[in-house]
């Protein structure tokens, strides 16, 4: 691995150039997404590569659709970086004051989710969950035995604002090995070995939409585009899968799913495996799209995950609703 400081997304893109508006256009032309490039940076990978069907610029902004898409992507990258910085600063400040634990209510900083989940942290179950995590973290204060790190517990929500959500992929609980969990379902930081489930996801992506299989498993590029990568349980004890199940996390993430179902329309839910599919009862199928398949794990991928074509189908559904598709290429 190179020793130089890795570049972030912002290093690769210059400010969008102003173009002269066309008097004959009153709306944006259609765009389609294809391909992409990879870069870990500190938050996400490169923005979607957009193929514009016409070069006509918008009258009001003077920007091409490609420039608009790039600027919007970069805006949300910057926002997710700010949210991450706030969480990191709060954890660092608490440790400097001799506290190992930061209350959960201080780690969800994305305002759109706080508005979508009013009062959730004041409910009795949330207090019990917070007390449980405090005991776990204080007990293990001398070693990082709870994953992901505290500042990444709500990474999925802090990276994908509520009003940005257009696709949801539900996992079960975080990876329980050192350095793997980063608060996004199925995702691992760059440099970590690809788990079998994630490798199978990439294989299906390659077969379905032609994406090349990346060398890393950081899915934050998807998250910034509006793919909510949500685990049902958001923390886990080291080397003990499901150790934080039935402690209150399921109630919280069920509230997240219900808020999407009730307050939004046209979201595409990808439910892989029985555990995720049980969440379908929380989703209004008359307002949203639910795609189901086997889990991508090595044990079940051959029993219905491979050839499910969920990635192309999700984009087809989004485009039919006039919503920009996901650039799945990392």
Swiss-Prot record:
The keyword Mitochondrion applies. CDD domains: UDG-F1-like. It catalyses: Hydrolyzes single-stranded DNA or mismatched double-stranded DNA and polynucleotides, releasing free uracil. InterPro entries: UDG_fam1 (IPR002043), Uracil-DNA_glycosylase-like (IPR005122), Uracil-DNA_glycosylase-like_sf (IPR036895). Pfam families: UDG (PF03167). It is found in: Mitochondrion. The gene is UNG. One of its GO terms (molecular function) is uracil DNA N-glycosylase activity. Disruption phenotype: No visible phenotype under standard growth conditions. Increased resistance to 5-fluorouracil cytotoxicity. Belongs to the uracil-DNA glycosylase (UDG) superfamily. UNG family. GO terms for biological process: base-excision repair. This is Uracil-DNA glycosylase, mitochondrial. One of its GO terms (cellular component) is mitochondrion.
